[in-house]
């Protein structure tokens, strides 16, 4: 993956921190295209264990993707609706139990879990329907990050915010491989989990506090994306 992408005619601008290759991390990233997965693997794959992505159940029907997901032991989420759970209450915690089982395997090994908190890829139409207060992002959902934190809490070394930007590019795997993504900007930054948010929210006030923390991260990410899309890197950059 790294060899393929680093041989393409792309101007790479990667800024921010390098992670401990033996660390266990929860990664929060914005999501615009399928190529985001490749980019996260490029920026993390050299120094850390191979990232694992929370994946929607619908994607298991897609060739290649399903094989990779099973082989790499991705946590695959069905995301049951309230109607589903009403008819079958036992489904309420099934995603959590499954993810916890997957991410609890080999607890002595480093683990990097990537969650796209927006829950779907950004498009102008989704942005309009989402009524997002952000210019370049959809509103973050808290369920995925909470689930990942619950699964990794006892061995988590840090939370990582990754911001992906593709100035002036049309985003698809074909555009990437045909040389039509001229520039990729990636910023990596570790963030702290505020005191009081270490445990799973159990009350409305705790849920509100967790949501407020996620919204503050997204506000900073949105401002960073604006700078990156205007061609301004966050600091001194490095090669992939």
Regions found by a protein language model. Name each.
Residues 22-24, 48-50, 108-110, 156:
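A general structural motif
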Residues 91-105:
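A Trp-anchored, charged/polar loop motif used as the substrate-binding/catalytic surface
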Residues 32-36, 94-95, 139-143:
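Short, glycine/acidic-rich beta->alpha junctions
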Residues 15-16, 28-31, 54-58, 116-118, ...:
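Short His-Asn-centered micro-motif
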Residues 198-240:
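Accessory terminal regions of nucleic-acid processing enzymes
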Residues 1-25, 39:
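Membrane-anchoring hydrophobic helices of lipid-metabolizing enzymes
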């Amino acid at each position: 993956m790294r060899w393929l992408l680093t041989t393409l005619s792309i101007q790479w601008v990667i800024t921010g921190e390098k992670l401990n290759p033996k660390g266990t991390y929860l990664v929060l990233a914005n999501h615009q295209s399928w190529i985001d997965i490749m980019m996260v693997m490029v920026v993390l794959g050299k120094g850390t264990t191979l990232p694992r992505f929370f994946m929607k159940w619908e994607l298991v029907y897609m060739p290649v993707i399903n094989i990779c997901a099973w082989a790499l032991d991705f946590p695959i989420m069905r995301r049951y609706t309230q109607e589903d759970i009403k008819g079958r209450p036992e489904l309420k915690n099934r995603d959590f139990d499954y993810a916890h089982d997957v991410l609890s395997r080999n607890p002595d090994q480093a683990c990097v879990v990537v969650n796209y908190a927006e829950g779907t890829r950004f498009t102008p139409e989704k942005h309009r329907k989402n009524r997002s207060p952000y210019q370049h992002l959809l509103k973050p959902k808290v369920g995925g990050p909470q689930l990942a934190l619950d699964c990794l809490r006892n061995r988590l070394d840090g939370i990582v915010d990754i911001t992906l930007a593709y100035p002036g590019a049309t985003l698809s795997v074909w555009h990437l491989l045909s040389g039509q993504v001229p520039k990729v900007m990636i910023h990596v930054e570790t963030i702290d989990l505020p005191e009081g948010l270490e445990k799973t929210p159990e009350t409305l006030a705790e849920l509100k506090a967790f949501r407020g923390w996620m919204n503050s991260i997204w506000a900073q990410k949105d401002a960073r994306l604006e700078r990156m899309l205007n061609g301004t890197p966050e600091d001194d950059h490095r090669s992939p």
